[in-house]
């Protein structure tokens, strides 16, 4: 009878715990990424909106139609959702629509404060230095900024996505790819201003890597 709600991904390989997913009798999927391979099989419910700015936007929309006022997000939860929207839209500058701002307004009504949300993005000196090193290592390839690096400190892995975001602010950069060694694997963060479909590129890269040589 347990319901497992998977948010911000539809792929089995990207969930936090495959064991929990497999043990739950019912699964609901809430995601905004373009549908590709590896979709979770036979979900009881799917909320899939590729044109939505973020999974946080979708969750906020759903919460407005569920339960009574007491069931709505508290201030901390609302600020977490607003942080998700701000992260995926780069502070409402990318991939935004009318529904994005309506969701943000709803979260504001639930008590979210942008000042406190902004503080959630503060970084340590270790994280900042790791991000700076990744940005400095980037090279240009066909209007794409590409950075490849060895391992970064485990506590600074958030710098991988942050570096990919920062590379988009460089003139003439339409997409960014930051690849960092993590143990025996590679963590890749890809970002785009819209002209380059980085999700398709990443999917093709995974297919190529998995093919026998």
Where are the language model's segments positioned?
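Hydrophobic helix-and-loop "lid/oligomerization" segment in the mid-to-C-terminal part
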Residues: 1, 87-210
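N-terminal small/polar loop signature for handling phosphorylated ligands or for N-terminal nucleophile
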Residues: 1-23
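Hydrophobic/aromatic beta-strand patches that form the interior of the parallel beta-sheet core
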Residues: 5, 26-30, 45-48, 145, ...
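Short glycine-rich anion-binding loops that position phosphate/pyrophosphate groups of nucleotides
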Residues: 9-12, 33-35, 152
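A generic local secondary-structure boundary/capping motif
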Residues: 16-19, 46-50, 71, 136, ...
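Short, structured coil segments at secondary-structure junctions
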Residues: 22-24, 40-43, 205
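Short alpha-helices
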Residues: 32-105
